[in-house]
Amino acid sequence: MSVDNLLDLLNDQQLAAVLNIDKPVRIIAGAGSGKTRVITTKIAYLIEKQNIDPSRILAVTFTNKAAKEMKERVLQITNNSFKSPFISTFHSWCSKVLRIDGKHIGLEDKFLIIDSDDQKRIIKSALKESNIELSENDKKTFDKKILYKIKEWKEELVDPSEAILNATSTLEKNFAVIYRLYQNTLLKNNSLDFDDLQIYVYRLFKQNNEILNKWRNAYDYVLVDEFQDTNELQFSLIKFLTINTNHLTVVGDPDQTIYSWRGAKLDIILNFNKTYSNAISIVLNQNYRSTKQILDISNSFIKNNKFREHKEIFTNNKSGKKVVLKECNSKTSEASYVSSKIKELVKQGYHYKDIFILYRMNAWSQEFEKELANKKIPFQLIGGIKFRERKVIKDAMAFLKMISIKDNLSSQRVLGLIPKIGNITIEKIINTANLNHLNIFDLITNEDKTLLHSITKNLDELIEVFKTAHQLYLDNTNIEEILKYLLIQSGYENKLKIRKEQDDLENINALYDQLKRFDEDFDPKYYSEENKLIAFLQEEALTSDIDEAEQIDKVSLLTVHAAKGLENKVVFITGLNQGIFPSRISETSINELEEERRALYVALTRAKDELFLTYVKGDYSHIMQSELKPSKFIHELDKDLYEFETQFLNTLLYDSNDYKQSSFYVSPKQHNLYNVGDHVEHKLFGKGVVVKIINDQLQISFTNSSYGIMMIATNNSALSKV
């Protein structure tokens, strides 16, 4: 479709957003308002109608999925095979800048980007080196806390020496010492973490005017998608490139700012005009996704936030069904209700893949997983272990990194996979490498055999495998061929076969397929690197999206945050309980509470056709260490905009044959036969003692610690006195 045809399809606000190119433009894009169409049409318009060279346009977003989708749409519109990828994530663009100009701040171009597992290993090693003593309790959470603190320091541009100098407590000083050791390890291994990518570019631009001007002059137009998610550092990079020009468009929705815990600042999009005083603001307020009923309840709810920019979203979509709010008497009955309702929906013509089950925290999915499995409803858990984070894939990637980038972290991992080499030998290799100022790969493949003869005398064949693989890399051999050679000749693949690790072998085969596609599609003009393997490793390091829902017929279970940017025909938002959604942390902070409210708004606006909200009343929660109460957000929903279903027997759930057949079926006849202290037995949970009675609910402490304390209805047919 031509650009002219696309412009004809836009509404007035969308058209204004595309055609305004002489002033900075802030587009406030309501949920489902077609922002991706607007931003891609604007890029195509700049290329086709303003004759701007595609490589002189920079468009940045926050996920590889979004960048890929935008790139594909622009290519479809323009039929343009441009020279280099100009649509990318912030991190990918920063990586490109550093590959080209990082040498001006002492960075080698073939640096390694480490992942979260590497970070944890470095922290563990730094902790050992520091001799800092931790209690058993602190050890459990130390990794998470220190990495969060390091991220915070980096975003505030605080280096390790400043962190040590400004430490005000023993804990903070310990964190700062670990930070210094962590950063030293990165420098020694020519490695960067994700935060470093942006920090190094910031420092490069700050310190070197010539390089800054080079990159400023590289672009005639800059566009930023999901602008509400930007942090101060990212906004600084945008300002570096655009502060002296009018050629900037930012797109975002303040009502969907749900990543403040990652550093996103709501004020940046709200106060855009303070930085760009001549900017114009355009609101996209027509929703193309949801029914009027879903949109009305979403609009009504988000108005409870005080710190926001008012906008009234409307739709011309056909009217749909009323939103349903369902009260359940336990987490089990909530899961049973949802699964029974899913079966009804499928009978009505929906597919399983048309349905999302959303929750605020991952722990809430457990009951749904059990119940869906029991009812033989196919489902997938989104945001579980990603393909690239599976151990076998990380092992394979370590082989590739060792023979190309030669980083010590990957070399240590590979050596640890070889049966003939133990931890003591690896330590000797590391120490010898440090003494001789060599990396591990160069040491073990060194022609001077005296360096390591006593340590690696049984590894001559393996060392030859590494040397041959390194030469294959230098010859730019297909990556699939290099990896197959490494995994077969090293004995790694055979080890998986002997152990009958079928899943791992299937994952390796999937990786071979991925490498084959990359080899076939590789074109150096799309990369800042001519070597296939290096280009692949660079691209893979920057791929960090949450697992996407596979295009197969399964119900998807995912957190509200993972659902951002997605949509589906039917959405269940579950666990609307105080302390769960909103989370406990929001109880002492207005800003946190407003962010939780925005998170629910995001969840509400994922639904296209039907929306169900569920909560539990009276059940005991181990998460909360108390009875579950309805979320305060339920009281903020307009009662005229939803249909309420109680936990009692006149609900749809009671009429479900599936539910009547379950061991949790509650008979209509009431039984008030229990007293505190009674010994009882449940057909599924075993024996226990009644510790509290609330109306017709029993709080039972079960002997089996796996179940602990649970709320069970007095008339539950699976329960009896003993």
Swiss-Prot record:
GO CC annotation: cytosol; DNA helicase complex
Catalytic reaction annotation: Couples ATP hydrolysis with the unwinding of duplex DNA by translocating in the 3'-5' direction; ATP + H2O = ADP + phosphate + H(+)
Pfam families referenced in this protein's UniProt entry, alphabetically: UvrD-helicase, UvrD_C
Enzyme class: isomerase
Record's keyword terms, sorted: ATP-binding, DNA damage, DNA repair, DNA replication, DNA-binding, Helicase, Hydrolase, Isomerase, Nucleotide-binding
Enzyme Commission number(s): 5.6.2.4
Cysteines engaged in disulfide bonds, as pairs: none
Binding residues for ATP: G32, S33, G34, K35, T36, R37, R289
GO biological process, one term: recombinational repair
Domain annotation UvrD-like helicase ATP-binding: ranges: 8-291
Source organism, top-level taxon: Bacteria
A GO molecular-function descriptor: ATP hydrolysis activity
Similarity-based family: Belongs to the helicase family. UvrD subfamily.
Job of this protein: Has both ATPase and helicase activities. Unwinds DNA duplexes with 3' to 5' polarity with respect to the bound strand and initiates unwinding most effectively when a single-stranded region is present. Involved in the post-incision events of nucleotide excision repair and methyl-directed mismatch repair.
Protein name, UniProt field: Probable DNA helicase II homolog
Origin species: Mycoplasma capricolum subsp. capricolum (strain California kid / ATCC 27343 / NCTC 10154)
